[in-house]
Curated annotation (Swiss-Prot):
This is Serine/threonine/tyrosine-interacting protein. Catalytically inactive phosphatase. Acts as a nuclear anchor for MAPK1/MAPK3 (ERK1/ERK2). Modulates cell-fate decisions and cell migration by spatiotemporal regulation of MAPK1/MAPK3 (ERK1/ERK2). By binding to the F-box of FBXW7, prevents the assembly of FBXW7 into the SCF E3 ubiquitin-protein ligase complex, and thereby inhibits degradation of its substrates. Plays a role in spermatogenesis. Gene3D superfamilies: Protein tyrosine phosphatase superfamily (3.90.190.10). SUPFAM superfamilies: (Phosphotyrosine protein) phosphatases II. Disulfide bonds: none annotated. Its main location: nucleus. It is found in: Nucleus; Cytoplasm, Cytosol. Interacts with MAPK1; independently of MAPK1 phosphorylation status. Interacts with CARHSP1/Crhsp-24. Interacts (via FQQ motif) with FBXW7 (via F-box domain); the interaction is direct and prevents FBXW7 interaction with SKP1, a component of the SCF(FBXW7) complex. One of its GO terms (biological process) is spermatogenesis. Disruption phenotype: Males are infertile due to a disrupted spermatid development, resulting in a >1000-fold decrease in spermatozoa production. Residues 28-176 form the Tyrosine-protein phosphatase domain. The lineage of its organism: Eukaryota, Metazoa, Chordata, Craniata, Vertebrata. Residues 199-223 are annotated as: Disordered. Changing residue 120 to C: Confers phosphatase activity.
Amino acid sequence: MEDVKLEFPSLPQCKDDAEEWTYPMRREMQEVLPGLFLGPYSSAMKSKLPILQKHGITHIICIRQNIEANFIKPNFQQLFRYLVLDIADNPVENIIRFFPMTKEFIDGSLQNGGKVLVHGNAGISRSAAFVIAYIMETFGMKYRDAFAYVQERRFCINPNAGFVHQLQEYEAIYLAKLTIQMMSPLQIERSLAVHSGTTGSVKRTHEEDDDFGNMQVATAQNG
């Protein structure tokens, strides 16, 4: 594939007067990026409506599994726009398939001056993984750097091992996707031609090896 230079926006840096993390803060939401908040379900409960409105929240991503639907629910559908994802906090759960729709949801909100809260149950594993994925793709970051950035703002995050593995895999996926999006039709055509030529060369090499092997067998039999 031809070299394509990808450009990403600068990552906002931590405020000098950032509040020092304390254990009770895990029950609250934190602003990870301007307009993007991460927190537990307790930060989106009915009793927290005044706080959500104070921070200007307009969109909420609610991450839960079916068995949690009775107590983790969209409480303000008449006030906020929701994206509800059915995802278990299980290492074998495929979360990569949801990354594109969550990025589109967050981007759409921020570009229109809105603010987004991403929450699961505890705000530690599932929701943290999605915020990390968003930051990786938006700012062109590796998993470990995006994790560290989010952890500076919400210290208690701890995506499960399966989610970590998928986030590490996602780096190559989003870079390839963005590279293709940046390429012109001519560049894509050239890249496909180069790939096809390489495949053809390999195929011809295998065929030549087979022909040579058959010739050796025939020679031995005739000898």
